[in-house]
Amino acid sequence: MPKNSHFSQKILTWFEISGRHDLPWQQHKKEQSDIYAVWLSEIMLQQTQVSTVIPYFQRFIAKFPTVIDLAAADWDEVANLWAGLGYYARAKNLHQGAKQVVDFIKHTGNFPQSVDQWQTIKGVGQSTAGAIVAMGVRGFGVICDGNVKRVLSRWAMISDDINKTATQKQLWQLAQALTPKHDSGKYAQAMMDLGATICTKNRPKCTLCPISADCQAYQKANPINYPVKNKS
């Protein structure tokens, strides 16, 4: 296991200089974040490329600018706007989740504020909840999606099957240990960006990676072989 020192700072510095800052859902440059926009984008980005999501996100925000608008919409309206994006269960969960969030706001006066609260919303898992809290609520949230797992598996050269429960637990523990208490929102965006643009699945750009000097898979092996997925 490489040393953790300055890991997050290297990631944040890279993001500031080389990361993407023009995605329509990004909140790190805004004075007040839009929790709804973060949630919507996180659901749309599940298993879907950024370039595909952008026009769908923009159409959704134009049609349903607030969570109240989305909750009040007919399912047919939502389904029509989602058409072509795939994984339609996400759209159903999003629509049902919007109704839950509106109900939560009615009772508390605000959006869910914690990871635990967000995980009660339909279709929101642990990593999505962490992303929403970190980037939308601007609290402390940990993400460990596919991009992050790939980065960490290579950096720490985790040789166990990524599909094993113990490996998943190890990755989550590592993600939590490396996430800075402050700026976890910008760090979350940076980690997802690093995985999507540099530490890619098939052709990682290791020479451009800010953590390549500490990356065990890059220094000792072939990053392409990580994360490990054993054939059953």
State where each predicted segment sits:
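Residues lining hydrophobic/aromatic ligand-binding pockets adjacent to catalytic sites
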Residues: 1
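Thiotemplate assembly-line natural product biosynthesis machinery
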Residues: 6-17
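Intrinsically disordered, low-complexity boundary segments flanking structured domains
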Residues: 10-11, 178-179, 230-231
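Catalytic cores of DNA base-excision repair glycosylases
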Residues: 16-205, 211-220, 224
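Short cysteine/histidine-rich metal-coordination sites, predominantly Zn2+-binding motifs
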Residues: 222-232
